């Protein structure tokens, strides 16, 4: 039986099962009923459309005028050669978004993906077949390999390259071969009405499934960020998360939990210090300036605060100082009430 709530439960469990170098199962739970598919479906679409990959975008073959031409000494015609070429999955070495790579083969030979590896690019499906040439053939071609997302048709590539020597290719950039999801029922706090999302991601080897999933998440966050300009949701979520994190530390506990000597405790109590977090927010000089706090008590407090991981005047809190101050003020107001 469900309780009446004012907000949906935020999932807390997340696992990644790497089945192989190219396949992974990514699970998250527990989701409220209906929330699983609400998040899984757009993530699946983004895995296909927004994951960065590499593809050949254009080719120039010496002695070949167009893709329907033939080449002396090569078993395949040019059209079949290009089909085989587009099946090769490239990676650019280094940080470049585009590489123009030259290849040359001569004499009787079967050419595979591994034969195109060089200092500029790598073919991840090394055993993929490309072409066969005889002893009289000399195959020379220049290939443009680019980084991108999704799919770009050859008509658009042709306009972008604007070079009649090159044959434009349909560019399939996405390295995600398959992305599926299952929504499973999961028991949470004795309640079976929660969901578990299981995403199965398969890539072609250009990137790992984990990297593909991270790309999809980043794309989703960026697309949703436009709404944050007017709603400030991200700040609210961050503050809520930080508040929860603070509650899990000693900072919101009473100073009695520090087991201070009676002299040190009484001095802090008279100064109105109630919570451990107040000591972390003070500088050493501010603490030393408390009325009747001697050097022995000062050293005792400093040592104990350091032992719990929050030295007096700690820089750990950084941006969370205001949140901690507000939380302490809220607790004090509740106690006074």
UniProtKB/Swiss-Prot annotation:
It catalyses: RNA(n) + a ribonucleoside 5'-triphosphate = RNA(n+1) + diphosphate. GO terms for biological process: DNA-templated transcription. One of its GO terms (cellular component) is cytoplasm. The keyword Transcription applies. The keyword Cytoplasm does not apply. Signal peptide: none annotated. Residues 1-231 are annotated as: Alpha N-terminal domain (alpha-NTD). GO terms for molecular function: DNA binding; DNA-directed RNA polymerase activity; protein dimerization activity. Its EC number is 2.7.7.6. InterPro entries: DNA-dir_RNA_pol_insert (IPR011262), DNA-dir_RNA_pol_RpoA/D/Rpb3 (IPR011263), DNA-dir_RpoA (IPR011773), RBP11-like (IPR036603), RNAP_asu_C (IPR011260), RNApol_insert_sf (IPR036643). Residues 247-337 are annotated as: Alpha C-terminal domain (alpha-CTD). Keywords: DNA-directed RNA polymerase, Nucleotidyltransferase, Transcription, Transferase. HAMAP family: RNApol_bact_RpoA. Homodimer. The RNAP catalytic core consists of 2 alpha, 1 beta, 1 beta' and 1 omega subunit. When a sigma factor is associated with the core the holoenzyme is formed, which can initiate transcription. NCBIfam families: PRK05182.2-3, PRK05182.2-5, rpoA. DNA-dependent RNA polymerase catalyzes the transcription of DNA into RNA using the four ribonucleoside triphosphates as substrates. The N-terminal domain is essential for RNAP assembly and basal transcription, whereas the C-terminal domain is involved in interaction with transcriptional regulators and with upstream promoter elements. Belongs to the RNA polymerase alpha chain family. This is DNA-directed RNA polymerase subunit alpha.
């Amino acid at each position: 039986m469900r309780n009446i709530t004012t907000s949906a439960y935020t999932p807390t469990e997340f696992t990644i099962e790497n089945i192989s170098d190219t396949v992974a199962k990514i699970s998250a739970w527990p989701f409220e009923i209906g929330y699983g598919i609400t998040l899984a479906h757009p993530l699946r679409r983004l895995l296909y459309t927004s994951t960065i990959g590499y593809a050949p975008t254009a080719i120039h073959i010496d002695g070949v005028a167009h893709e329907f031409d033939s080449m002396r000494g090569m078993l395949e015609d040019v059209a079949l050669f290009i089909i085989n070429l587009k099946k090769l999955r490239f990676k650019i070495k280094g940080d470049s978004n585009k590489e123009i790579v030259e290849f040359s083969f001569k004499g009787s030979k079967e050419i595979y993906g591994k034969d195109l590896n060089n200092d500029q690019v790598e073919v991840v499906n090394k055993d993929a077949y490309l072409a066969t040439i005889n002893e009289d053939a000399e195959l020379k071609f220049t290939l443009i390999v680019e980084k991108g997302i999704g799919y770009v048709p050859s008509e658009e590539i042709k306009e972008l390259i604007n070079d009649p020597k090159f044959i434009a290719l349909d560019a399939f950039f996405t390295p995600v071969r398959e992305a599926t999801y299952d929504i499973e029922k999961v028991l949470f706090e004795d309640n079976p009405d929660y969901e578990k999302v299981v995403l199965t991601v398969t890539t072609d080897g250009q990137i790992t499934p984990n990297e593909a999933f991270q790309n999809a998440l980043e794309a989703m966050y960026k697309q949703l960020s436009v709404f944050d300009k007017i709603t400030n949701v991200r700040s609210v979520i961050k503050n809520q998360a930080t508040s929860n994190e603070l509650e899990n530390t000693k900072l919101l506990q009473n100073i009695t939990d520090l087991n201070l000597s009676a002299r040190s405790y009484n001095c802090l109590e008279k100064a109105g210090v109630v919570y451990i977090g107040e000591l972390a927010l003070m500088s050493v000089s501010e603490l030393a300036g408390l009325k009747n706090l001697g050097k022995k008590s000062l050293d005792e407090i400093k040592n104990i605060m350091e032992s719990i991981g929050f030295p007096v005047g700690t820089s750990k809190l950084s941006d969370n100082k205001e949140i901690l101050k507000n939380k302490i003020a809220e607790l004090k107001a509740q106690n006074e009430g």
